[in-house]
């Protein structure tokens, strides 16, 4: 049995570590970085101050921010043009999942001869890339959700099909990660909830995924516990620095752990994100109890095994009740139909997209297209599997 274990990169953690950004560039021999963040962040005073500090070290600092949530392939192509015309030699990716994913994809694609979609996470497609031409990446998350800072992939939407594609290469893992909780203090309660549930989905699906990976299991368990202890605290008091640090850590841990696998929560979410622009963390939160109850026969013993660690009664029902209570306390809608118009959606097409998503193969219970369609129907009606 041959299994490769890949774990995080260099991580600089703590308050005010953002002030070490120029030092991080120096350590990686980056002399002309491209600063990537989304258009919602670029005009914030916090980000303006970061850019001003960087310009003291890099007078001709180039920036790219022409994208928002759920980025598309064209955003990456435009960023690559900025990178190359500015003769950059590295990327600083700052933001939530979108900013990190776009920045990583730009660093990956800046010198490749093949189109982006040729590197989708299918089989050995990643070997098509010229790994010697992938630029160094520094990742700075401003939300605690996707954990893209410790991931080796980017989620990018193919505008023509509406499908969210995973672009993968081992060298897309950032070389230095800066986790500074001060950058997350002004995150709204709504985004704190959605991104926190995204991190929970990563840790939970990694823990439940089939296969032998005790290192990932241990990291995922602690990630779930950090979220259980701190998500409500940060939701109620955004300035709780310890809770914010816990959530940043849990997000990075989730992305680290899910190399073991993801499952139906993510494969159901990706089509909804791509076709209807629903926030990824929010859709993960909505689908979570429906997928848990669908998978119950396969994961019940696994779930019971962590209940003691989470100070829950030792039963699947106790864990499910915690998830439902957590969602309620975070004002997460119970049904998919609460966040989008489900009256005229093509469930056949949506369930086929979910079935073809790479995450489906990591679900602990084998799935077919009809299973995924049934979970969609349950999430629309609000009825959990018995």
Question: Can you describe what each PLM-predicted range is?
Answer:
Residues 1-28:
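N-terminal amphipathic/basic leader segments beginning at the initiator methionine
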Residues 19-34, 52-57, 85:
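Glycine-rich phosphate/diphosphate-binding loops that line cofactor/substrate pockets in enzymes
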Residues 42-115, 233-244:
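N-terminal small/polar loop signature for handling phosphorylated ligands or for N-terminal nucleophile
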Residues 74-181:
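Glycine/threonine-rich beta-strand-loop-alpha-helix active-site module
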Residues 152-260, 370:
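Carboxylate- and glycine-rich phosphate/diphosphate-binding segment that chelates Mg2+/Mn2+
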Residues 262-315:
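C-terminal catalytic subdomain
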Residues 303, 307, 313-386:
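C-terminal charged capping/lid subdomain of soluble metabolic enzymes
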């Amino acid at each position: 049995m041959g299994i490769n274990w890949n774990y995080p990169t260099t991580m600089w953690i703590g308050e005010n570590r953002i002030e070490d950004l120029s030092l991080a560039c120096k350590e990686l021999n980056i002399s002309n970085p491209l600063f990537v963040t989304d258009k919602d962040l670029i005009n914030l005073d916090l980000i303006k101050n970061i850019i001003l500090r960087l310009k003291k070290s890099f007078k001709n600092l180039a920036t790219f921010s022409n994208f928002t949530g759920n980025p598309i392939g064209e955003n990456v192509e435009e960023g690559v043009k900025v990178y190359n015309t500015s003769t950059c030699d590295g990327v600083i990716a700052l933001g939530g999942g979108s900013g990190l994913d776009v920045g990583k994809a730009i660093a990956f694609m800046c010198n490749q001869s093949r189109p982006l979609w040729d590197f989708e996470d299918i089989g050995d497609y990643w070997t098509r890339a010229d790994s010697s031409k992938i630029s160094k990446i520094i990742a700075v998350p401003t939300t605690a959700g996707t954990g893209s800072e410790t991931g080796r992939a980017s989620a990018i939407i193919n505008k023509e099909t509406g499908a969210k594609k995973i672009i993968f290469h081992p060298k897309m893992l950032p070389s230095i990660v800066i986790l500074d909780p001060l950058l997350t203090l002004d995150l709204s309660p709504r985004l704190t909830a959605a991104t926190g549930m995204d991190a929970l989905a990563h840790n939970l699906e990694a823990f439940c995924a089939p296969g032998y990976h005790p290192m990932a299991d241990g990291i995922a368990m602690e990630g779930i516990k950090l979220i259980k202890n701190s998500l409500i605290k940060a939701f109620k008091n955004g300035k709780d620095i310890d809770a914010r640090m816990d959530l940043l850590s849990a997000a990075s841990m989730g992305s680290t752990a899910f190399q073991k696998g993801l499952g139906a929560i993510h494969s159901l979410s990706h089509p909804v994100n791509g076709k209807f622009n629903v926030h990824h963390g929010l859709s993960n939160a909505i689908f979570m109890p429906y997928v848990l109850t669908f998978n119950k026969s396969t994961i019940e013993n696994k779930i019971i095994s962590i209940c003691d660690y989470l100070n829950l009664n030792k039963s699947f029902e106790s864990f499910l009740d915690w998830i439902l209570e957590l969602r309620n306390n975070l004002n997460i809608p119970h049904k998919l139909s609460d966040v989008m118009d489900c009256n005229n959606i093509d469930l056949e097409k949506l369930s086929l997209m979910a079935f073809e998503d790479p995450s489906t193969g990591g679900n602990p219970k084998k799935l077919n297209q009809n299973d995924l369609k049934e979970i969609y129907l349950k999430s629309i009606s609000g009825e959990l599997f018995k």
